[in-house]
Amino acid sequence: MAEPVMMTREGDIVTILLNRPESGNRQTDATWAKVTEMFDAGSRESRLIIFKGAGDDFCLGREAMGQATPVLEAYAVRERSETIFNLYGAFRNARVPIIGVVQGRAVGLGCALAALCDITIAGHRARFQFPETAHRIMPTIAFSALVDRVPRKAASFMMYSAQEIDAQKALTFGIASDVVPSNDLDRAVSTLVEHLKKMPLPAVLALKEYARSAFGMSTQSATDFARNLHATVNSFSGMKS
């Protein structure tokens, strides 16, 4: 039986694959916790991480999405939610860039993770949706994935409406970075990866460090951080080799 999630390494490139195509790559909380561990480990040992799903769809979210679940006390609900918040943290705190590759549908948690990738390349047939309100779920867990990625009006529309959007609209909303013909998706990702492989590793890591922090700073603080990081990294001898 195939593993539901897989991590492979080729040189210093790590690929994390959601590998349940027969169920739209839905995962249980236990396997989402495993994905978190994979990102933490892969981030320490690579220059970049490619995140993708097997089959026709990127990811349709959590295994139990839309199904009846036992009524839990608030503290137990909070403890259960930590699995997803820890997963979000692994994306945000990774020391290397994460490239998301989205084909087909990205729904619920799948849509949140597509947004959390540093760069998200989507095929033109990709579709994105947060359906939680249609299932009588108040979706602040999903919403929190977007607060540093997606403008307020766009995020509010997706959460309140539960409507599916296409790849071009996801691009304007800030969920996707680029949209390419679906048949060219692998080629577009390979081209980007080859470019990043040629960059000095200190530059790859420094760009992620800056992106992780700068957008939460004041303009002056972000400028000061850029000034320091630029001087520190570009004067390093390893940038020339």
Annotate the PLM regions.
Residues T36-D40, Y88, C111:
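Short hydrophobic/charged patches on amphipathic alpha-helices used for structural packing
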Residues R44-E45, G53-L87, A106, S218:
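Glycine- (often His-adjacent) and acidic-residue-rich active-site loop
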